[in-house]
Amino acid sequence: MSRKVAFALIFCLSAGSVFAQEQSAKTTSEKTKEMFERALSRAESATAVSHQIKDVFARAAKAVVKIHGVDEHSEICGTGFFIDPTGTLYTAYTVGGEAGNFTIEFNGKKYPARQLLADIRSGTAMLKIDEATPALPIGKSEQLEVATPVVSIGFPLDLPETPNFGMVAGFDRKYLGRYFSTTHMRLNLPSQRGEAGAPLLNMKGEVVGIVVSSLENNAACYAVPIEAAEKIRGDFMRFGEARHGWVGINVSMARQPVEGSLAEMTQIMEDTPAARSGIKAGDILLQVGRKKVTQPEDVLDASFFITAGDVVPVTVMRGNQKLTFSVQATMHPASRTGLLLAAPGTPAMNQQAIPLSLRSDVPPTP
């Protein structure tokens, strides 16, 4: 091999090595830049979320209050929030349901409050003070999905007003084999004693639920949808009481779907609104009021929103015929029983069966 050829070969190898090193350095630099940009993006996202939470808290906190009361065992305290400008507020039944001598801490002062309504089936209560107040806007829990971010504001333990941030973990109709009276939202949201009755807010600052119980060592909690409380408030405005409706049907799983529904009428109780309307065992239930039915469990939500005395359209499939009956609902037999409805074959549960009360029990003062 000539010296010129050897020199040229060595030069090419050296140049290739230098080029490879430059490319490697460039690749490393690009990767470092990409990692930095991703970290910066995450930091900016976290900052944006933090600002959003602060904004929700700043706008909503002035309408959230601490509630004191006394029941037959001890003093209690929990959280509530105003829903109109005339001093009406929502809280959890465990706070405002069975206690009395209520005092509300609002705007740096204490005000006496009275109970308007306590409904054990929904797990909610309404109190009122005679003052002009701010009010939280009402949202729609139906717009929430699993992993939707949410904020609660409450008074944990004996601490000041505190925001909590988490997300929707699920929509449950039962807990430990026993059914709720309506679907509850399970939240990856830490909750302590004293936070029962706290508003659950979407990122617009609208109320979408009320915190009612805690789970898993306070790392998660349940909230009842705001629509359930609004249903009870609507009853109160019309009748002065909660009026849970009932039509008198039992449903079970059909062998095969009919028009998309597996809910088959298995029993029509005698002398009930359903029996008088002409509904029969064997009919496949498609819709109750505005609620579509596809599974037997759908009847829980559908029936919860029925008001006694109202005429409710009930649509069924009977053979090849789609029929709609007008059924006038009567008062639900369980209107004054437990918050949790028992599953078939299990004993009934009352509100004390909720995993953990979130109210704070305080030893009575001498």
Label the predicted regions.
Residues 21-82, 88-93, 101, 124, ...:
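N-terminal activation segment of mature serine protease catalytic domains
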Residues 87, 147-153, 205, 274, ...:
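A structural signal for short beta-strand/turn segments enriched in small hydrophobics and glycine
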Residues 26-55, 152, 156, 203, ...:
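C-terminal cap/linker of serine protease catalytic domains
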Residues 25, 186, 190, 237-302, ...:
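PDZ/PDZ-like groove recognition
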